[in-house]
A protein has these predicted regions:
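Residue patterns forming the tRNA-binding/recognition surfaces of aminoacyl-tRNA synthetases
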Residues: 2-20, 26, 30-34, 106-243, ...
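N-terminal catalytic cores of NTP/NDP-binding nucleotidyl/phosphoryl-transfer enzymes
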Residues: 42-103, 164, 234-242, 249, ...
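Acidic, turn-prone loop/beta-hairpin segments
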Residues: 95, 184, 188, 194-202, ...
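Residues immediately within or flanking Cys/His clusters that coordinate Zn2+
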Residues: 184, 399, 468-470, 513, ...
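Short cysteine-rich clusters marking metal-coordination/redox-active sites
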Residues: 187, 402, 473, 516-519, ...
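Protease-associated
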Residues: 247, 254-328, 337-341
Length: 924
């Protein structure tokens, strides 16, 4: 007789090979036919709301790994909340305006953008942005991200622009917006102001100079000193700013020394605390401090500029420190915020001797027309020749660069629009207290950034952006922004989009009969030519998209990368507080690290170390990318490399093989009729469910804490340690050899069903494709929605199946004995004493505290140890002896037993197998 036919051999049709790159697109088509997103909302309608507001990626390129990590985490969160009974609307968005798209389209099309009409240029930018929205959307859909992809928000859409105009109007009306001439970050290459969030710092080589400013005054306070020999020594790392010098700042409370170097007929004034350091840099080993005075003593004295025919006033400022330099601070109000405020306090006129392109103006004399970087060596040489250079050094310092063109920027005073953050800073800081921060230090980071920030420069000298909705009266010249003008422009943009601003005259946009609210004249009006900072666009999304189109505010959660503390998190907070007069627009704020290569380096094209999500989809499948995101501690930088994905493939296969084992052995099992009650289950099976309960609790806690890597690692450990290495090995004999519908087999199948059902639900937020594939292949209870695992809640622990703690302690001891037995069996195999473990008989000695093992049924214990025979005695310590089993090998189950052949008519079978075969009435 061919006994193989009598075995319950695993069969389910669930493939061992995943074939994800081919199988996943089929699943995407299934989800599309199912209308997964909308069906999910219908299923959970009326349940508690969880709203994750999408931070809009920039629509200027294909997906990169940073996009993939961010969207994967968002999908994990939304799916996990949906499967815990929440209503989870999710509207994806895109940030469309700004310099990155202008730069990209100019580079791509080699356009002379200045020769193009504004309308044509903006149309080209719009088409470019739309193209990459489609590219990115397809990539996110390929990842399996569940969202309303047919109705995303775009910051360039007319409706959004109209609502953003109203946000600007609210902030203006609240008195927080003004126009002023003050220093801002300026990119000479792109000829526009920049926000702090658009600045990147790089280490650059630099020549730092110590410069002598000769005393100009008649020395009424110092009559005993020779004016012609006396100079103040300043220090700067930006030589090109020296033509803009108007003052030298001293700390009023610090002591300043008049210093005479040995062998030189000159006198230098510098901070006494820095004298030794500065004189050393100047090459003077020997010097004399002639006298000292407090900084306040020199206030309003005049020094001569070292190479221009003008003077420099001595002023006082508390920000002058003794950390570096000379204590005499070069002050150019056109190039620094502190400089500007100090000179403003002393009533000095603003001087900006550099134009939009970073070239010196006529004010700089012989350097007029030179770019700032070109003038540095020329000015340096001129100072050397004139004898005004005290010393110079070559250093490397951290210098700001434009985030888009990567070129050095300058600090330059220009007329700009600002949001006065100072006027509502305290409210913004207080709003941070009501937010759950993940990680917790996020609160202090954002609070400190808001506390330290200056006013927000919100104007840009660009054409691809939302126009600043302000008019100017031609008669009085004052800016105009009222409820009436805001309503008119918002209504116009709603109908025609913001291109109307560039295509229509001011009078045609304003209400008929409109007059200037300042002077009452109707002589004519002009439009503002600047556009709004892109951070104002994205900072308005919580109002312009979430509240006005979705109907709820604030969002439950914001989640973005670490850089968004100074970007989107901050701009959203400032708009919410400054414009709307509310608190933070999010209840929870979560951040993740950067994506880096396997060595921890940033990924750059020049290094060739980047990874393309599309290539990962094609090589490994989207579920492997999701597993990468779900297995990484995203609070720090997340590494990705081909080696990492190969390792993840092994972890993935462990889970897939676990699911396959369950599915293969659940063929013919109906949970509606075949589930075994806890009291009727074998204790081993209840042990497995009790271990599952521990996993469920850990997974729930991990999802609550957004620790997705803990979810993945816990499930992987459960599959490897509890199931594959222990439980599955033991129950194979029961599953394959016991009667198909026997109580013992149904007991094991009950445990397998509960395990598979719970694990599939728990892992579904992360392994979306694979868990859906499992769900569609597995048996279900009538209460389940078999269409998608996402339509079902995660299970709670099966408390009714749980073993008491003392029983679990016994099983821990059994597992320890099994480990010892396995070691002894390995040695016996190596010694050729036995072949397979079922050929063995083991003698086990256990210490007194484990005496319960001696009382266990010998056959049951042999099954647990996967040997044919076992004897247990109580002694001093745990020992194991292995010998060949006594008896004959059963032709069906392969156990070696003395009872084989004792059933009449079944000479080669053990009694258990004989009974099963007899019941099947199988004839060869």
């Amino acid at each position: 007789m061919e006994y193989k036919k009598t075995l319950n051999m695993p069969k389910s049709g669930f493939p061992m090979r995943a074939g994800l790159p081919k199988r996943e697109p089929e699943m995407l088509r299934y989800w599309e036919q199912l209308d997964l997103y909308n069906e999910l909302l219908k299923k959970n309608e009326g349940k508690p709301l969880f709203s994750l507001h999408d931070g809009p990626p920039f629509s200027n390129g294909a997906l990169h790994m940073g996009h993939a990590l961010n969207k994967a985490l968002k999908d994990f969160i939304n799916r996990s909340y949906a499967m815990r009974g929440y209503y989870t609307p999710y509207i994806p968005g895109w940030d469309n305006h700004g310099m990155p798209i202008e730069s990209a389209i100019i580079k791509q099309n080699k356009l002379n953008h200045k020769a193009m009409s504004v309308a044509d240029f903006r149309t080209a930018c719009h088409e470019f942005a739309d193209h990459y929205i489609d590219v990115q959307r397809e990539g996110f859909k390929r990842m399996g991200v569940v969202a309303d992809w047919d109705h995303p928000y775009k910051t360039m859409d007319p409706g959004f622009e109209a609502r953003e105009v109203r946000v600007f109007g609210k902030m203006y009306k609240n008195g927080h917006i003004y126009k002023g001439l003050k220093p801002v970050y300026w990119c000479p290459h792109d000829e526009t102001a920049l926000a702090e969030a658009e600045i990147e710092y790089q280490d650059d080589p630099c020549t730092t100079v110590y410069v002598k400013f000769p005393m100009h005054d008649d020395l009424g306070k110092l009559p005993h000193l020779d004016k012609s020999k006396l100079s103040f020594v300043i220090w700067t790392t930006t030589i090109w700013t020296l033509p803009g010098n108007l003052a030298i700042a001293l700390n009023p409370a610090e002591s300043y020394a008049v210093v005479k170097p040995a062998g030189r007929d000159e006198l230098y004034i510098m901070a006494e605390a820095l004298t030794e350091k500065v004189m050393g840099i100047g090459g003077f080993d020997s010097y004399e401090i002639v006298e000292t005075h407090p900084g306040a003593f020199f206030e309003n004295m005049l020094a001569s500029h070292p190479f221009l025919p003008k003077t420099s006033r001595l002023v006082l400022a508390d920000y002058v420190t003794m950390d570096s330099g000379t204590g005499c601070v070069h002050t150019a109000p056109g190039f620094g915020a502190d400089d500007y405020q100090t000179c403003l306090r002393y009533g000095m006129d603003m001087v900006v001797p550099v134009d939009d392109q970073g070239r010196h103006t006529d004010y700089a004399g012989k350097y007029a027309g030179m770019k700032t970087e070109e003038s540095n060596p020329v000015i340096l040489q001129d100072m050397k020749e004139a004898g005004s250079l005290f010393a110079s050094q070559e250093i490397v310092h951290s210098y700001p660069h434009c985030w888009r063109c990567k070129k050095p920027i300058i600090f330059r005073a220009t007329p700009q629009w600002f949001c006065s953050v100072e006027s509502f800073k305290d409210d913004a800081i207080a709003a941070c207290e009501d937010v759950r921060w993940v990680p917790s230090w996020g609160k202090d980071r954002l609070r400190s950034m808001v506390l330290e920030r200056t006013d927000w420069c919100i104007s840009r000298q660009r054409r691809w952006g939302l126009p600043i909705p302000v008019f100017y009266c031609k008669d009085c010249g004052k800016p105009i922004c009222t409820d009436e003008t805001i309503d008119a422009i918002a209504g116009l943009f709603e109908k025609k989009g913001s291109n109307a601003w560039f295509e229509m005259e001011a009078e045609d946009m304003l209400p008929e009969g409109f007059t200037c609210p300042h002077c009452g004249k109707a002589a004519g009006f002009e439009k503002e030519t600047d556009t709004l900072d892109g951070w104002f666009d994205s900072g308005s999304t919580h109002y312009a998209s979430m509240e006005r189109t979705q109907g709820f505010w604030p969002a439950t959660m914001y989640i973005e990368g670490l850089d968004q503390y100074r970007g989107w998190f901050q701009s959203s907070l400032l708009v919410a507080v400054g414009a709307l007069g509310r608190g933070a627009p999010f209840k929870e704020c979560l951040t993740h690290g950067w994506t880096v290569d396997g060595q921890g380096r940033a990924m750059h094209k020049s290094l060739g170390n980047g990874m393309d999500p599309a290539e990962i989809f094609n090589k490994y499948g989207a579920d492997l990318l999701r597993l990468w995101a779900g297995s990484s501690d995203y609070h720090v930088d997340v590494r990705c490399s081909d080696d990492i994905f190969k390792q993840l493939s092994q972890n993935y296969l462990k889970f897939r093989n676990t699911a396959k084992f369950c599915l293969d052995n659940l063929t013919g099992f109906d949970p509606e009729t075949d589930l075994v009650a806890p009291a009727d289950m074998q204790e081993l099976d209840r042990w497995a469910v009790t271990r599952l309960n521990s996993l469920i609790r850990r997974v729930f806690d991990s999802y609550d804490a957004y620790e997705f890597h803990a979810v993945s690692h816990a499930i992987n450990d459960f599959c490897v340690v509890d199931l594959s290495s222990f439980y599955f090995d033991i129950i194979k004999d029961r599953l394959y050899c016991d009667g198909e519908r026997s109580a013992s087999r149904r007991s094991a199948q009950t445990a397998l069903f509960l395990i598979l059902d719970a694990m599939t639900r728990m892992f579904a937020p992360i392994l979306a494709f694979t868990c859906e594939e499992i769900w569609l292949a597995m048996p279900h209870r009538s209460a389940d929605d078999s269409r998608s695992v996402l339509f079902n809640c995660m299970v709670q622990p099966y408390e009714g199946y749980a073993l008491p703690e003392d029983a679990m302690d016994r099983w821990a001891k059994i597992a320890a004995v099994r480990t010892a037995v396995n070691g002894a069996l390995e040695q016996a195999r190596a010694d050729k004493t036995i072949g397979k473990s079922l050929e063995a008989e083991v003698d086990v000695t256990v210490p007194a505290e484990d005496a319960f093992l001696a009382d266990m049924d010998a056959d049951t214990l042999a099954d647990l140890l996967i040997v044919s025979q076992v004897r247990v005695t109580v002694g001093d310590a745990l020992t194991v002896t292995v010998a060949p089993a006594r008896g004959v090998k059963c032709a069906r189950c392969w156990k070696v037993l003395t009872s084989v052949g004792t059933v009449e008519g079944h000479d080669t079978l053990c009694p258990r197998c004989a009974a099963v075969v007899k019941s099947l009435s199988v004839v060869e």
